Amino acid sequence: VFALQTRGIQVLIKDAQGKQVGLYKESHALVIGASHYTEGWPKLPGVKEDVQSVNKILEEHGFEVVTVNNPDSEQLNRVYKDFINTYGRKPENRLLLYFAGHGYTKKMSYGSEMGYIVPVDAPNPENDIDGFVNKAMDMQQIEVFAKRIESKHALFLFDSCFSGSLFALSRAIPKSISYKTSWPVRQFITAGSAEETVPDRSTFREQFVAALEGEGDVNEDGYITGTELGVFLQDTVINYTKESQHPQYGKIRDRNLDKGDFVFALGRDVYEQPAEPGDVETFNFSDIESERENARKLAEIKAKWTKWQKKFDAAYDKALKYDKDTYLSSSKKAQAWKRIVDTFRQDNPYSTEDQLIRSKAV
């Protein structure tokens, strides 16, 4: 279960002319680290440091970060669902989803390839391919999650190596910020392609952090777009790993979700801190509550007088019958009238009927 929180920082996106072309009202990140594998995969102790480093840089960029360590297959599926259901409903949010762990590419019988991310309880496919397929999360499921998000911008990063055939791979040329930047988009970046492996010391993570520290601003406009990040990671990771890793970048194959660009803002002037709230310490409803209480008491008093008047009327009717009763003596009749006058001697403030009855009874 995710708590609904926001850092209270809004991110403004402006074009080269200073015109605002977009706004992120909330920024949320899901960072998943899988290191303690139990079913035949090599453990990845360096993932713990990777997660901490990624969390830190994302928080510096205004993200509220949810961290999940060593999820099994059920937990992995649930945390993606919960995160998206909790934070992915608002159009003005930006969502970043980062997975660090093993990846795998399975050659399908029809000739294509399917990429997977591997939870800690998934068997090694070399030993148990059926068990692996049942436990691992394939890219088709990631695509389902991506389309379930209603927030305009979502960026999926995988510090894993697998086939990215489900999204449109590209070597895009970063474009300047424009109104198109704010259009909906789902972007994906992986640390490597099929048949490659990610070392425990992650060059991908190191370069991701370096990019967000400013090195990824390819066109030096004060922003890093998802496209710029993809280009930067492709260049630097290939270089620093001596071509043992080839990061993949692309957008989802959906014309409704491939026009915009995820944005990181480098300048602090683009972060808008909401105004301080006004003083609410003295706020109360005491005057309203006092008036309500007075009205309630008056209503109770009026109800009692109404009941009192009904009893007075009934007593008068009874005494009137006694007065006409030939079996009663004059003294008993007089006692009946006197008893009414003595008992109902108060003046009813809500009626004049009591005064009329009292005058007849005397």
Where are these regions (language model features)?
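Cysteine endopeptidase catalytic domains of the caspase/legumain-like
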Residues: 2-324, 335-349, 353-361
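Alpha-helical protein-protein interaction scaffolds
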Residues: 330-331
